[in-house]
Amino acid sequence: MNKYLAELFGTFWLVLGGCGSAVLAAAFPDVGIGLLGVSLAFGLTVLTMAFAIGHISGCHLNPAVTIGLWAGGRFEAKEIVPYILAQVIGGVIAGGVLYTIASGQMGFDATSSGFASNGYGEHSPGGYSLTSALVTEIVMAMMFLLVILGATDQRAPQGFAPIAIGLCLTLIHLISIPVTNTSVNPARSTGVALYVGDWATAQLWLFWVAPILGALLGAVAYKLISGSNKD
């Protein structure tokens, strides 16, 4: 039970910290943190939680990561469903807390503001198509898993995995916020989309399918590039 609670709290922190920075601080007049700040916020949530709960649950915080680690031979199949349930619950609770805070500002409307939801077409920050969004999310998730598997490999320098993984997520956001508002994490997308409804839930399928597919590809890619070094 401890590891499931760790995943719940960890994903809560990721959604509250990352999406919270986007909703509350990104465009704050004069001192808003902007795209760079939001990207760093997401990376910092993973970095801090990796040190806090990595020894308890492995600090997945992401259904795609959980499935990718299973595909990479690092995780048991029987744990996939409870991990994903804990992650989604944590994300949804964080979305509710953030919605409560944001609603305290006069004129706030989750649907019209987007509430840090992920989208494509007219709901992409840069107006990118479904195809662009699909390719972006698959490739970003693939690279994320490759970095995770590499950084946590027993042959890698020890103690630096949280830094590498946190910086990787920051870089992913710097690249892809203009395209999809960056998901690579179905729990993160679900956690805010449920409070927007409408278009956000209609487009949510892509932010489950693409990250999971990308994570599976990342697991395959890491096996290909690391296999010859095992002996």
From Swiss-Prot:
The keyword Transport applies. PROSITE patterns: MIP. SUPFAM superfamilies: Aquaporin-like. The record marks 19 as: Involved in tetramerization or stability of the tetramer. GO terms for cellular component: plasma membrane. The keyword Lipid biosynthesis does not apply. It is a multi-pass membrane protein. InterPro entries: Aquaporin-like, Aquaporin_transptr, Aquaporin_Z, MIP, MIP_CS. The record marks 42, 173, 182, 188 as: Selectivity filter. Homotetramer. Aquaporins contain two tandem repeats each containing three membrane-spanning domains and a pore-forming loop with the signature motif Asn-Pro-Ala (NPA). Channel that permits osmotically driven movement of water in both directions. It is involved in the osmoregulation and in the maintenance of cell turgor during volume expansion in rapidly growing cells. It mediates rapid entry or exit of water in response to abrupt changes in osmolarity. This is Aquaporin Z. It comes from Vibrio vulnificus (strain YJ016). The gene is aqpZ.
